[in-house]
From Swiss-Prot:
Keywords: Activator, DNA-binding, Host nucleus, Host-virus interaction, Repeat, Transcription, Transcription regulation. Residues 1024-1072 are annotated as: Interaction with human UBE2I. The C-terminus is involved in dimerization, DNA binding, and transcription factor binding. The approximate tandem repeats seems of variable length depending on the isolate. It comes from Human herpesvirus 6A (strain Uganda-1102). Transcriptional transactivator. This is Immediate-early protein 2. Residues 427-436, 1190-1199 have a biased composition (Basic residues). GO terms for cellular component: host cell nucleus.
Amino acid sequence: MEPAKPSGNNMGSNDERMQDYRPDPMMEESIKEILEESLMCDTSFDDLIIPGLESFGLIIPESSNNIESNNVEEGSDGELKTLAEQKCKQGNDNDVIQSAMKLSGLYCDADITHTQPLSDNTHQDPIYSQESRIFTKTIQDPRIVAQTHRQCTSSASNLQSNESGSTQVRFASELPNQLLQPMYTSHNQNANLQNNFTSLPYQPYHDPYRDIESSYRESRNTNRGYDYNFRHHPYRPRGGNGKYNYYNPNSKYQQPYKRCFTRTYNRRGRGHRSYDCSDRSADLPYEHYTYPNYEQQNPDPRMNNYKDFTQLTNKFNFESYDYSMAFSTDSTHVQSDNYNHPTKAQTIPETTKTKKHEATKDNETSTENQVLTPDVISLSYRPSSYKMDIIKKIYDTDVIPLPKEALTANGSNRDVDIQKYKKAHIRCRSVQKKKERSSQTNKHDENHASSRSDLKERKSNENEDKAVTKARDFSKLNPLLSPLPLTPEPAIDFADHTDKFYSTPEFNQIQQNLHRSKTSLQDTVPISKHTPRAPTKDNSYKKHHDSKDNYPKMKHSPGRTTSKKNTTNSNGHQNFKEVSVKNVSGKATSTSPKSKTHHYSSSSDEEGQYKSPVKTIIQSPSPYCKLKNPSIMDKNSAKNHTASADKNLTDNSPIRSNLNPTAFNKSNSNKSITNSTSNSDECTDRKPNCNSTKNESKDPNRTCGKNSDKHLSKSCTMASKRAPSRASSRASSRDSSRASSRASSRASSRDSSRASSRASSRDSSRASSRASSRASSKASSRASSRASSRASSRDSSRASSKASSRASSRDSSRASSRDSSRDSSRASSRASSRDSSRASSKASRKASSRASSRASSRASSKASGKASSEASSRASSRNSSRASSRASSRASSRDSSRASSRASSRDSSRASSKASRKASSRASSRASSRELRQIYCDSNKRQTPPHDTSINTKFEISEIKFRCGEDLNFYKNTAARLQCFNHNDQFYNPRFRPHIRTNRKKSESTNDTDSESSMSRCKSHCRNSPDSLTVVRRKKHKSGSSSISSSIEENCRSNSHIVTGKEKFTPFYYQSSRTRSSSSSSSSSASLSCSKSTLKTCRKTQYKDNKQIKSKSDSKHKTTNMSSDYESNRHADVFKNSPEAGEKFPLHNSSPFNTHEQSNHSENAIDEEQKKAPNITTSHLQGKQNVRLHNTKKCKKKRPRDDDSDSSIKNFCKKRISGAQKTESEVSEPDDLCYRDYVRLKERKVSEKFKIHRGRVATKDFQKLFRNTMRAFEYKQIPKKPCNEKNLKEAVYDICCNGLSNNAAIIMYFTRSKKVAQIIKIMQKELMIRPNITVSEAFKMNHAPPKYYDKDEIKRFIQLQKQGPQELWDKFENNTTHDLFTRHSDVKTMIIYAATPIDFVGAVKTCNKYAKDNPKEIVLRVCSIIDGDNPISIYNPISKEFKSKFSTLSKC
């Protein structure tokens, strides 16, 4: 007989368990007699039972605590004592059970030695006295025992007993009442020993992570009317009445922060505030939806939610699966099986070993004399396999390890160094994840530029490595037994404390490279455009990094391994470890190849944001991997690339090895110059992040021969910190549209503006040999792009960059003012900027660079021929280049993007004049006559993730949308990243969103180049006419200044001057957003754009041009759409996240997608953004009004208005958008009605026929009740009786007797009201934190009209029934029908299944608790299912295993 079951299966409260252990003398005597008769031996009851009871803490001595003699009663002789000792030594059942439980942490030894006298009649302070050996036994409640021992031993020393007596124990399931909890810590608080029960849901006052997570925990555990964790936003008022209405479940803006359980029922009147039953009142704040509220059961203020669902059991009982290692001895005195396993003192990392630990280690010989407090929690027990088998046989379950809080010096924060713990914790986690991630995780690049402090830290961390090595040994074992924490780490910014390890030769090489980069610009120049580059450090780093570091420290996520080698994936692409660099100003970026487990390390790690993998766009000519700069993705500008480019990852490309740069150069030197920028897919990377400021000195990049290996190795060394040159080259080809100085003069700050310059062609190696030919223009543009990317990335150190820029700007400004007149300067600069804009903004990089260089050279030569000599043309180009270099020098000390953007726009506006317009028109017509590939980029659109976007209608979506999936999702970020993409209008009914405009603006699909609207529409809707005249509407950012370059308008106007018949391209527009992360992007988008004053003068001239080309524009729209559709299928769009999008939807990283899948998702939201965006180009748009009106009517007819999601056939007839009521004449035409209006009309006529207006209808009048109406039967009180509790208990008992519960279910009926809805949500949450539970969605039922049967039909049925089941089945025929209408009721139903009887009983108790509290609104029923099975097959093995074990153990 087992005296007390240690499993803690008792489901009652602590008071109920207390009653179970009250001593009963009669029962004791009867048990003694039965046992002695059954055993038929001379062994006494005391020998058999008393030691076992003692081992479970049920008996304590009254007058002494000498536990070794506890098994001796007054009349006992020495033989029995000797027999008991022998049994303990032989490992009898009691000893095995006790030892197994001890090792599993289920109880704590209470070997107590005291030195104070004890009064006779109390059990609070048992004292051991050497003289007193007279004992009496009394069965005690174990909680009183625990309390007694705790009070007695708070300051007493605990010596191990040398004799083999049984010891007193305390069960995890036998904890004292909640009211006694303060006693557990009150005695030791003076000594600053916080002895908390780490595995219990209620926690003591002290939290070891309080210093780190105090603000988070306080906000989570405090009852507030609203959640302070929400980011406050101008559109997110706390009252819940704005656009971001947390209390409106139909609001699209609620999704990222949506409550765990939105409306579990369908109700009438939704969408109107006074009937909105989903309004969350202040007494049920957000925390109660995320984590259950236990205030009713636990008023203890020390409760802390540790987010461990195994602890959130009903009424804090320890269920059968919860055998957490709650109790053990002090960590300073560790027991392990035969001392074969490392103890806690060994497993603690060196950095967390405090002086106390060291002293303990030194004094191991005197540990027997140390104080041992039994209430200290420890993870030190590591059961051997033999003991673990015993534990599993006894409890039939696995031991669940404690959360990691137990690692912090047993809950005491007194001696723990948090900073050291963080480092060691990261290392342990890194080692723990090394196995599973080593084959997939991108390793650290061996060429990461390291801080000089890394070497010192690496030397200082050698002691930590020893602890990591020991932890690695543990991690090879069963993860259940591993001392490394498996729970999520706290929200600590560990990334700032992670370090990189470099071998000595690597470190020396890095130092040399850093030294070279200080002295020469050429050191940072890569040979191939495949080589990634990123900016060096400038002033913007000072906020975050130490001044003595040459480069900012690399940040990486804690789980990453710190391996030095670059791995090569199966496709031959090299994986670079991503490194997050704070505040990178040069934003030239691209991405590394996508692997399955590839996530970007970013500062959003601290925010808990989900990092979605970003697929790389790699074309076969340039298959090499590119490094993603994650700091750009961190804040609001995540790059999203087309998913269709995945097929390119399988290209058989040469493996790029940093160890052999020569081979790489040989294999790619031929292709890298010509092919690397030839595809417009690569251009999709070129967002405003590709900041291309100006180069200040002659282009040092054109070293193709002997220096190639050296430069490649250097550039690869800097690869992890540099953005690739391809990105910058694309950016510069785009930005050459804004100035000829950018298109040509940036290649070398003096020479490259001459289109046929031989110096430039000499520098650019073989491609520039023919100066005036296409190769020359190609080379010059490529050189300019490389130089601009170098300048934008700030390859050189700040000092050299500043010096060269100052010198060049000084000399060039003087020279230009001397050499050229102002008019010629303006003319050539203006002409070249416009012409290169015409060519470069359009398509593939290759054709664009060729056309832009040719156009700029021709235009500048013609304009300068008019104005002055060729020298003045050169001087004017020099002037603009030096102005831009002035801008870049300004930007290097500040945020380079803003400065260069402002300065270059200023200079270009000065340089632009009316004299150059004719030349630029001619050159642009030549350049535009070429068929160029098209780039589409919308900087403001968030992309839609790759869901099944073929679902276009709301009816289809309403069929597939399973609302319970969102409601039962306990992981906010999961819901956010899966369901909360930006413009998912089809999931919401516009009728119930009064804050969103239902009248859509007219579609500008023909002549609209609005980058916010038509650019994101696919196929015919999203492709625009080349002559379209609309200018981007821009949102004004929070700073109050529009950061969008006015060069967008410039591009529009320059494209609309002269249009030839063969023109098929659409200009490329994007909007740069001046945000924290992409602040430097605006320089690339606005470097040589016109100022607003110049734009006003331009609009008048262009308005005249627009009138002339309007007819041509309309005629060519169809051709353009065909061309652009073809291009859109081949080259996907890239949409940059606007700052508003990043704030509305906190998904910094989003999945890749194809733009042509997106139009249905984004049309409504596009119009909404247009509505919100201030139109700063109103005067310009007025000129285009006639063109836009031309296509308005068509698009309005194309798109039917869907304003009701209840209509299942809503697409077959016209919709009425206006909310005004229709007149009788309108109503008479059924064609003009939507389905719902049609039904309402009939409903009103039927109600008038039956004279039904308001109030109740007699239940016997079936014709009135089941009339044609959409109204539901409404019940304020549920028409059911509550379940008899006695019958319920018996039914549950009968169901669970056979060990199966899958043949039964629980049915909950409840009414529609706010109160009931909130109760059901809480009940759902409480059910779903249990395992093996399936809860259905709350659903309505449809009811057919009733019918009475007469006697004849009943008699016929009885006769069939008497013939047997087969005859009844075969001969039964019932063709009874009705001619009325069905009605539905507002009584909701929910079904709950449980896989095992344990879960079934728990679910029934949970449901019954709420049904008892609300008998008129909620009713519980338990039903049996014939031939029942689990709802899904996942639970089948669970049920079978439970059944087999149940059958086996029931026979014992």
